[in-house]
């Protein structure tokens, strides 16, 4: 797939252009320099042509926190991209930072570079000011307004004009990484991807955007989503943190799996419980990762079991969730995490024959009969699997409205155990035996 990077100094509108092209607010936009500090990826389309769009941190000459790391991110993006959109601002004019960016881009002569002059909504169309931008040496400029949508079509025409061999998209398994600030989420992403894709530091909340990264492992395609650290709501003061909190919820909503990262070197706190609650609410598989295991003090053969016991008590609503101990910074026990991810992926794709399911539930009813109600006893006489993000089963019975939640929980736990679905949640729907059901899988 064609890859397109948007590059420029801070505050020229890179994230606004990125959002305009992909038509959603994926990158956090604000007036503060460097608010987009990692490179953000998204799929985009123009005139039936698909391409991958990359937003980057801004390059600038002045001394500035994260300057060197942002420059490294931009260089990664430039190396990776087939087309580079060099964005400058008509409103602010050209300065040394723009020439600095141009100097870097000229080193990449094999790349297609498109100069886009943003914030040009006030420009007179009859003005002859192209020469100021032609000095950069990148053919004719495209005058646009990302905020107002002016000139975007012409720029996109030039982007998709680049010819590349089509690569067939494969099914990808998406998992997001969530946790409070500074528990090592970005270090874990870098460890998995074997590159400094994310800006990492010991300053809490270095990562503010949700960032998608595609990679292959064992011939399977994955998408990993790293998110901003979740603070307690009372501490969410800046707009940026509010946006990031919403982005975490959005990331969860488009994931197949949630990786909850805890800091093993500190006591688990209320924030960790709130984050685990988000995972529970989503009702999709999750894995609890205890990171920084390398710096946990006074470990012995019982330490891990003590941690597991504490986690099971604190997060009792995630009793089925696997727990993995690792050190992202030391690249230790990462394979343990991937073994769990692969197992969950396989379990989510399992399909079960209706006869097997019905026989299983009959046996469970024989072992533990449904409780009586004023009209008699409930009897489940048929079970089938239907489409769902997690294994979803419909149980047909008489008077389902009288089924007690404790018996439903008994069935859920026993079905999960009997079918080997110990590391994923399942959903049970109880329907009247006369109801029709949609989305039923064909039995094999």
Curated annotation (Swiss-Prot):
Binding site for GTP 1: 8-15, 55-59, 118-121
PROSITE patterns xrefs: G_ENGA
GO BP term, example: ribosome biogenesis
UniProt key word Cell membrane: no
Domain of life: Bacteria
Membrane spanning stretches: none
InterPro entries xref list: G_ENGA (IPR031166), GTP-bd (IPR006073), GTPase_Der (IPR016484), KH_dom-like (IPR032859), KH_dom-like_a/b (IPR015946), P-loop_NTPase (IPR027417), Small_GTP-bd (IPR005225)
Residues bound to GTP 2: 179-186, 226-230, 291-294
Keyword Magnesium part of the UniProt annotation: no
Residue ranges constituting the EngA-type G domain according to the UniProt record: 2-167, 173-349
Domain KH-like as annotated: residue spans: 350-434
Single Gene Ontology MF annotation: ribosome binding
Biological role: GTPase that plays an essential role in the late steps of ribosome biogenesis.
Subunit structure: Associates with the 50S ribosomal subunit.
HAMAP family xrefs: GTPase_Der (MF_00195)
Protein name, UniProt field: GTPase Der
Gene name per UniProt: der
């Amino acid at each position: 797939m064609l890859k397109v990077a948007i590059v420029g100094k801070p505050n020229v509108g890179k994230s606004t252009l990125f959002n305009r092209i992909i038509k959603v607010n994926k990158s956090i936009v604000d007036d503060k320099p460097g608010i987009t500090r990692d490179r953000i990826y998204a799929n985009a389309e123009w005139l039936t042509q698909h391409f991958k769009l990359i937003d980057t941190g801004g390059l600038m000459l002045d001394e500035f926190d994260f300057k060197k790391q942002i420059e490294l991110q931009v260089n990664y993006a430039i190396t990776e991209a087939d087309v580079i959109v060099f964005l400058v601002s008509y409103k602010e004019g050209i300065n040394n930072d723009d020439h600095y960016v141009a100097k870097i881009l000229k080193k990449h002569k094999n790349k297609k570079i498109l100069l886009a002059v943003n914030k040009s909504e006030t420009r007179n169309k009859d003005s002859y000011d192209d020469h100021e931008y032609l000095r950069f040496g990148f053919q004719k400029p495209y005058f646009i307004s990302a905020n107002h949508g002016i000139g975007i079509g012409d720029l996109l025409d030039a982007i998709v004009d680049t010819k590349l061999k089509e690569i067939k998209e494969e099914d990808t398994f998406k998992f997001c990484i969530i946790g409070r600030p500074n528990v090592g989420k970005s270090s874990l992403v870098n460890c998995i991807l074997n590159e400094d894709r994310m800006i990492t530091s010991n300053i809490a909340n270095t990562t503010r955007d949700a960032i998608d990264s595609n990679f292959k492992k064992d011939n399977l395609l994955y998408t990993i989503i790293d998110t901003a650290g979740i603070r307690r709501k009372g501490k969410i003061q800046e707009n940026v943190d509010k946006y990031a909190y919403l982005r975490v919820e959005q990331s969860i909503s488009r994931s197949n799996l949630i990786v909850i990262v805890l800091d093993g070197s500190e006591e688990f706190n209320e924030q960790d419980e709130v984050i685990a609650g988000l995972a529970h609410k989503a009702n999709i598989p999750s894995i609890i990762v205890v990171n920084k295991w390398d710096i946990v003090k006074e470990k012995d053969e019982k330490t891990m079991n003590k941690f597991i016991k504490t986690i099971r008590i604190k997060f009792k609503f995630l009793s089925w969730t696997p727990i993995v101990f690792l050190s992202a910074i030391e690249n230790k026990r990462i394979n343990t995490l991937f073994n769990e991810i692969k197992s969950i992926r396989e379990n989510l794709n399992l399909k079960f024959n209706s006869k097997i399911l019905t026989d299983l539930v009959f046996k469970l009813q024989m072992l533990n009969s449904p409780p009586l109600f004023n009209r008699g006893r409930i009897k489940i006489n048929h079970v089938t699997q239907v489409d769902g993000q997690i294994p979803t089963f419909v149980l047909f019975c008489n008077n389902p409205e009288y089924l007690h939640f404790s018996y439903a929980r008994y069935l859920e736990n026993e079905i999960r155990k009997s079918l080997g679905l110990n590391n994923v949640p399942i959903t049970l729907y109880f329907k009247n035996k006369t109801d029709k059901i949609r989305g039923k899988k064909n039995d094999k």
